[in-house]
């Protein structure tokens, strides 16, 4: 009998707290502060910081930095508002820096 495989998870690089599901990845083609980043539809076990307007590669956005709830490691940010119509799909979504997350249970 084959063993059931659970969800593929991403964890905080520092403490291994689960922060995202592979199935929630919308795109792997984003740029973060430290390099490549992934856009997720959902996140878990994170703290969302205060909102601020930030000029990003795709224009002005209101974002809030996100960090691990357990160790406070900065992980990326949440898109709160996109000012350009073409960028509205990002609202409510999360950017995780690839360097800040690791695959867990794969």
Swiss-Prot record:
The keyword Metal-binding applies. Pfam families: Yippee-Mis18 (PF03226). It comes from the Eukaryota. GO terms for molecular function: metal ion binding. Residues 8-105 form the Yippee domain. Zn(2+) binds at residues 12, 15, 68, 71. The keyword Metal-binding applies. Belongs to the yippee family. PANTHER family: PROTEIN YIPPEE-LIKE CG15309-RELATED. This is Protein yippee-like At4g27745.
């Amino acid at each position: 009998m084959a063993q059931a495989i659970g969800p593929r998870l991403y964890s905080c690089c520092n403490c291994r707290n689960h922060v995202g599901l592979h199935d929630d990845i919308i795109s792997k083609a984003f740029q973060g502060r430290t390099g490549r980043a992934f856009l997720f539809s959902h996140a878990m076990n994170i703290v969302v910081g205060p909102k601020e307007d930030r000029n990003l590669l795709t224009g002005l956005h209101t974002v809030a930095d996100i960090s691990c709830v357990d160790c406070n490691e900065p992980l990326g940010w949440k898109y709160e508002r996109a000012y350009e119509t073409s960028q509205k799909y990002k609202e409510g979504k999360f950017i995780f820096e690839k360097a800040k997350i690791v695959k867990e249970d794969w």
